[in-house]
Amino acid sequence: MSVVPTLVPPPQPSLAPGEALVLWALRLGAAQPANGPLIDQELSLAYGPLDGPPAAGALARLAATLERHGRRKLRLAHPAEAAPTPDERAVLLLLAASQARDWALRDALLLWLVRPAGRDAAARAALALGAALDRGGHALPLARVG
């Protein structure tokens, strides 16, 4: 059996491991949509064969909703970049608010990020991704993002 090296960069000191994983996957998917299978593989390695695919699906749905219904094109950094952009911070905070069930903050971020037609879909995807991250032991910090 051969070992498949992981391509996920190690967590940066300023980012929680879950934050680093989400940013890497969002950035890699945006940089090259053909990287979907690689992202699926990495999330399956991180969360296991049962929780990895739902996490990958929720991430793909959130990314697609943000792309299709975003108020504007999000600014994402290169996948290996350490620091999150302001838009990436907003997405991480959206996920943290969804995990914490802080509906007021989640709704405020949805108003900022997504046009009305996509808000329900973005809310469902953020909740699903937040739950998948929770099951994998990655609670995102609500007080400090990035």
Please tell me what each predicted stretch does.
Residues 1-146:
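Polar/charged low-complexity regulatory segments
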